[in-house]
């Protein structure tokens, strides 16, 4: 079973939120909405199809965050000559997070600090 306003699929509940947030704020929001809640993750193409259909009902061709990211400081950087990176002068560290369009299930990345709509997923009870 799912809480009111959430939609069941398999053993999980899903809800689309129209209020744009940064990726980090959206993930925090999802964790506050339901026990075990997170930004949506996909375990199969069928699940992705279900979520795209769910988002298309409320949003048209919008950016929708999912729970996948590449945190900038977790990247392994290295020089092409194999030397260790012991000097850095980055202008600004930027993390990239993954989104999909409400019209298809193709994944794209963009800076996590930008705003997007989002889908929360939590275990059904």
Curated annotation (Swiss-Prot):
Per UniProt, subcellular location reads as: Secreted
The keyword Disulfide bond is assigned to this record: yes
Disulphide-bridged cysteine pairs: 2-13, 30-120, 97-112
Q: What sequence ranges are listed for the domain C-type lectin?
A: 1-122
Pfam family for this entry, one = Lectin_C
Q: Which InterPro entries does the entry link to? A: C-type_lectin-like, C-type_lectin-like/link_sf, C-type_lectin/snaclec_domain, C-type_lectin_CS, CTDL_fold
Supply one GO molecular-function term.
toxin activity
The Gene Ontology CC terms held by the record are: extracellular region
Keyword Secreted in record: yes
The record's account of tissue expression is: Expressed by the venom gland.
Instruction: Please tell me where this protein is predominantly located.
Output: secreted
Residues holding Ca(2+): 41, 47
Q: Which UniProt keywords apply?
A: Blood coagulation cascade inhibiting toxin, Calcium, Disulfide bond, Hemostasis impairing toxin, Metal-binding, Secreted, Toxin
Tell me, in a sentence or two, what this protein's role is. Answer: Anticoagulant protein which binds to coagulation factor IX (F9) and coagulation factor X (F10) in the presence of calcium. It may bind the gamma-carboxyglutamic acid-domain regions of factors with a 1 to 1 stoichiometry. The dissociation constant (K(d)) are 6.6 nM for factor IX (F9) and 125 nM for factor X (F10). Does not bind carbohydrates.
Q: Which family does it belong to?
A: Belongs to the snaclec family.
Kindly state the subunit structure of this protein: Heterodimer of subunits A and B; disulfide-linked.
The protein, known as: Snaclec coagulation factor IX/factor X-binding protein subunit B
**Organismal lineage:** Eukaryota, Metazoa, Chordata, Craniata, Vertebrata
